[in-house]
Amino acid sequence: MMIMRKXHPLLKIVNDSFVDLPTPSNISSWWNFGSLLGICLVTQIITGLFLAMHYTSDTATAFSSVTHICRDVNYGWLIRYMHANGASMFFICLFIHVGRGIYYGSYMLSETWNIGIVLFLTTMATAFVGYVLPWGQMSFWGATVITNLLSAIPYIGTTLVEWIWGGFSVDKATLTRFFAFHFILPFIITALVLVHLLFLHETGSNNPSGLNSNSDKIPFHPYYTIKDLLGVLLLLMVLMILVLFXPDVLGDPDNYTPANPLNTPAHIKPEWYFLFAYAILRSIPNKLGGVLALILSILILALFPLLNTSKQHGLTYRPITQFLYWIFIANLLILTWIGGQPVEYPFTTIGQMASILYFSIIIIFMPIASMIENDILKLHF
């Protein structure tokens, strides 16, 4: 008799994706982050569902409903902080996952890579609308500032902003629709994840050597299920340490003040995971130019497969591009720091220089470095 997991129509899909999947034998722990993102997504959906049971998306009661969750609901504080800090863990895993893709040349699997970019943008949109829901000062002003950027679009900008707001300012209609978006988007993300995996399993995984690994594959279970389980335990440990010991360390104190349209906070800034993009936005004095730079800071990822001039897959044996890669990572950290600083000298100048470097490394320096490496190694085929 055939094993059920291999013959059953539904179990067969699960089996081919998580059990009998042929996997390169040498993939390192940097490949764990895909499964960790899956765990983050499931955690966020579950905690989010329980929060939605007690939350009210009305300007008069939103802030107090979050307070009620933390004070009166059984383990409400735990669910709320797991959800808030879970978002931070989600983005940490996301950044590492994308960083690994850039380092090891995974962008050459272009369908998987492009769906990944769509996933990244959708996750950013979800996190943004979610941050508005507690209806604190930073929620309100963050929503006002970021949605207002759309007014930079010529001709239709102002109409578009008012259409998104559902009125002439961020108000009850805005909060209600943002809650609706925040509820539906994770399920859209889940569907996109399945497409992401579908495309990945068409080609198979990349590996640290950058060489074809078809001759040396091992089953996903038990080898990588155990390896992923270690990652999951470490992730949950870090998350719970964050939640139980320093739950507010990544948040903004201003968000403990109820939203007040008549009082602007001294420094309006988004959550830490958006600061790099916010710094790029602020580094351009022109409104439309800033918005375009903001969008391009993410969409530039789509250029990686097109700008690849190297004859080798990944940066494992390419020291010059490796050096540029780590400068790029350091530059990203500088942008994150600048995004959280006030708009004054010297921060503006540092931000402008870091923004120029961000785009220059990807568009100019990396392709040139790859060509130099080809030349040194005489890879002219």
Curated annotation (Swiss-Prot):
Predominant cellular place of this UniProt entry's protein: mitochondrion
A single GO BP: mitochondrial electron transport, ubiquinol to cytochrome c
Membrane topology: Multi-pass membrane protein
GO molecular function, one term: metal ion binding
Compartment list: Mitochondrion inner membrane
Binding site for heme b b562: 83, 182
Protein keywords: Electron transport, Heme, Iron, Membrane, Metal-binding, Mitochondrion, Mitochondrion inner membrane, Respiratory chain, Transmembrane, Transmembrane helix, Transport, Ubiquinone
InterPro entries: Cyt_b/b6_C (IPR005798), Cyt_b/b6_C_sf (IPR036150), Cyt_b/b6_N (IPR005797), Cytb/b6-like_sf (IPR027387), Cytochrome_b (IPR030689), Cytochrome_b_C_euk/bac (IPR048260), Cytochrome_b_N_euk/bac (IPR048259), Di-haem_cyt_TM (IPR016174)
Keyword Transmembrane helix set for record: yes
UniProt-annotated binding residues for a ubiquinone: 201
TM region(s), chain numbering: 33-53, 77-98, 113-133, 178-198, 226-246, 288-308, 320-340, 347-367
Family: Belongs to the cytochrome b family.
UniProt miscellaneous comment: Heme 1 (or BL or b562) is low-potential and absorbs at about 562 nm, and heme 2 (or BH or b566) is high-potential and absorbs at about 566 nm.
Subunit: The cytochrome bc1 complex contains 11 subunits: 3 respiratory subunits (MT-CYB, CYC1 and UQCRFS1), 2 core proteins (UQCRC1 and UQCRC2) and 6 low-molecular weight proteins (UQCRH/QCR6, UQCRB/QCR7, UQCRQ/QCR8, UQCR10/QCR9, UQCR11/QCR10 and a cleavage product of UQCRFS1). This cytochrome bc1 complex then forms a dimer.
Protein name: Cytochrome b
